[in-house]
């Protein structure tokens, strides 16, 4: 999801999206540890999207 789509969301929606992203990050990390992660770039994508959401949450306060 790009930054423009994230800016359109409310703070509650961003918090829910952040929770989903953290769950996805945990799942990807577990797959990586067990050697079952074929697309290693996904961890980077999720980490960056978490940073985008946290940035928007901090700037809306």
UniProtKB/Swiss-Prot annotation:
Gene Ontology molecular-function annotations? structural constituent of ribosome
GO cellular component terms listed in the entry, alphabetical order: cytosolic large ribosomal subunit
Q: Which CDD domains match?
A: Ribosomal_L29_HIP
Q: Which Pfam families match?
A: Ribosomal_L29
Keyword Ribonucleoprotein on this protein? yes
The record's section on InterPro entries has: Ribosomal_protein_uL29, Ribosomal_uL29, Ribosomal_uL29_sf
Swiss-Prot/TrEMBL keywords: Ribonucleoprotein, Ribosomal protein
Q: List the disulfide bonds.
A: none
Give the GO terms filed under biological process for this record: translation
What Gene3D superfamilies does the record tag this protein with?
1.10.287.310
> Which HAMAP family did the record assign?
Ribosomal_uL29
Membership in a protein family = Belongs to the universal ribosomal protein uL29 family.
Protein name, per record: Large ribosomal subunit protein uL29
User: Which organism encodes this protein?
Assistant: Xanthomonas axonopodis pv. citri (strain 306)
């Amino acid at each position: 999801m790009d930054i423009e789509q994230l800016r359109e969301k409310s703070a509650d929606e961003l918090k829910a999206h952040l929770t989903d992203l953290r769950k996805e990050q945990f799942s990807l990390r577990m797959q990586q540890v067990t050697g079952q992660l074929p697309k290693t770039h996904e961890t980077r994508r999720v980490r960056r999207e978490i940073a985008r959401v946290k940035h928007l949450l901090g700037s809306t306060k």
